[in-house]
């Protein structure tokens, strides 16, 4: 499948907040770790600090959990 930096991908991990959402690959680690793709999204998740509007907008995924959009 060969996902690389800058690709638009759709998340296929069912338990993820961003399931079926499209994000942009920020980096791909080739050292052999399981969740080697860092994906950045436009919207933030629900994990913001109390009293702020923010949350995380990146997450790590395995290549098998992503498909090119």
Swiss-Prot record:
Matching SUPFAM superfamilies: Electron transport accessory proteins (SSF50090)
Membrane topology: Peripheral membrane protein
Pfam families membership: PSI_PsaE (PF02427)
Entry keyword annotation includes Membrane: yes
GO CC field: photosystem I reaction center; plasma membrane-derived thylakoid membrane
Subcellular location: Cellular thylakoid membrane
Keyword Mitochondrion on entry: no
GO biological process, one term: photosynthesis
Family classification: Belongs to the PsaE family.
NCBIfam families: PRK02749.1
Function in brief: Stabilizes the interaction between PsaC and the PSI core, assists the docking of the ferredoxin to PSI and interacts with ferredoxin-NADP oxidoreductase.
PANTHER family reported in the protein's UniProt record: PHOTOSYSTEM I REACTION CENTER SUBUNIT IV A, CHLOROPLASTIC-RELATED, PHOTOSYSTEM I SUBUNIT IV
Protein name in the entry: Photosystem I reaction center subunit IV
Gene name of this polypeptide: psaE
């Amino acid at each position: 499948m060969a996902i690389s930096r800058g690709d638009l991908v759709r998340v296929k991990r069912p338990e993820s907040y961003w399931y079926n959402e499209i994000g942009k690959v920020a980096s791909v680690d080739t050292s052999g770790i399981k969740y080697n793709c860092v994906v950045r999204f436009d919207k933030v998740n629900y994990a913001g600090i109390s009293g702020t509007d923010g949350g995380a907008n990146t997450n790590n995924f395995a290549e098998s959990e992503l498909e090119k959009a």
